[in-house]
A protein has these predicted regions:
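N-terminal beta1-alpha1 cap of cysteine-dependent amidohydrolase-like domains
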Residues: 1-85, 92-113, 118
Length: 120
């Protein structure tokens, strides 16, 4: 399985993702740079975590306007699986590939606590 690992300036989990896809899942990952077109032979795409563009405005908002996102949207229309992890998820929301919006938390500070989630 050919998997594209999208790399933005500030991504810092792309090498970890590449290793897991290659060495654990025995897939064929390839780095896909934010300013280059996606290869046409991909079976899936992963947007890994990190701090794309330093998360200066809102998490993922600048990356959501990178040239590669148009290609990600095109493959999404074809039904090719896309996974966003951490900042990658935020990029998918900011780009409109996932529904909803990202909101600031009540404290306006980083929070690390367990949250219960029910998937319906």
């Amino acid at each position: 399985m050919n998997v594209g690992v999208v790399v933005f300036p500030g991504s810092n989990c792309d090498r970890d993702m590449f290793h897991v896809l290659s060495d654990v899942f025995h897939m064929t990952p390839q780095y896909c740079w934010h300013d280059k077109p996606l290869p046409e032979n991909l079976d899936a795409v992963v947007l890994p975590g990190g701090f794309s563009y330093g998360d200066r405005l809102r998490a993922g908002v600048i990356a959501a306007h990178s040239p590669i996102i148009q290609d990600v949207k095109k493959i999404a229309e074809k039904g090719i699986p896309i996974l966003g992890v951490c900042n990658g998820f935020q990029i998918l929301v900011e780009s409109g590939l996932l529904p909803g919006v990202l909101l600031k938390n009540d404290s306006l500070n980083f929070m690390c606590e367990w949250t219960n989630l029910t998937v319906e």
